[in-house]
């Protein structure tokens, strides 16, 4: 969070904020919209009691008086006058909205950093730390989860609300020869994100191991942020193409066909890479001129090489009673092949939306003593 203070020069009607030593001049319209009086803002919900869209676009500050570093009194040309606290406008200077910044990682990430015992999450302080860790690294591994069917739903509700899809409220991952998805067969699955053909894409996936009697079937996780950073060093134009040009993703089943178009690299509101939509089994090259198609494909191919590079891959065996939760936009997942004749390998999975852990984190941040 920035170090903030008000500054109003004597005799001036200009309101400035000093943010980490930088002077930011506040627009009269921006400031007027953020009035804090109880007749304009509901204190409980923090929802406005007036329509800011109806404000005069040419509104001006008639006078501004600095009470101290944290408070100013401002009079506007529409007749409104009120006090402004620096605390009230501070969130607008935090482009991460109070959330921890992502920490990009590679294969040298210590799995212990993202591992928590599920029963320990009964403590709000531990739950807060677990969610903070998830938001930083994009993944969690939970141990001591009851190895019973549908336990995953209870875990999911700890972090958010279950997202129902055409696969149901949850789905079983085991070998099925005639399945509608390769995930249900014992073949190797390269790094990918789930459901890029869906709108919106399920933001978070949970996979819970009930039984794993095979010697194969190792789980893999890859942080797309590290791979994109490397690609940007090698081919900045390629990153630009992958983040600006939409590709078609398509899923076909007996009773449903889903098609969505979106860029392979997703950017956040600041224009920074936030993740990917990546599934070579499901995407199609966009219709472009030949030169752009070749440049796009080279970037796509190189990104795939980085995703499959062991230097970027976290590789582990998910045991019965363990659950991994990961940001389906940021962290790609995969699996080594396994022999179903060795024994049973049974996982259950489900999805929740991205805003679940974020909302819980911000709520806990207000109440948990740090």
Give a label for each model feature:
Residues 1-123:
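Motif-centric detector for short Cys/His coordination patterns
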